[in-house]
Design a protein with these regions (language model features):
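Single-stranded RNA-binding regions, centering on S1/OB-family and related RNA-binding modules
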Residues: 1-71
Length: 71
């Protein structure tokens, strides 16, 4: 989790969504992060890290760009 504090952007694939946002598996660390916003499973996205909670190991992000849409 400390790794997310050093980087402010990450790239990954959407693995699931709910009514609030989407869960993304980070390509570099293989960790799952959350962003508030719309998406679809399989989308490739770039995110900006907004908050890292080391106690609960939660990373909250915002969507920067959709790199590719799910097929």
């Amino acid at each position: 989790m400390e790794m997310f504090e050093r980087f402010n952007t990450l790239v990954g694939e959407v693995i699931g969504c709910n009514s609030h946002g989407c869960y993304v598996r980070d390509d570099e660390t293989d960790k799952v992060v959350f962003y508030y916003g719309c998406g679809q499973r399989g989308d490739r996205v770039q995110l900006t890290v907004k908050k890292v909670n080391l106690e609960t190991e939660q990373v909250t992000c915002v969507l920067d760009a959709v790199l590719s849409y799910a097929a």
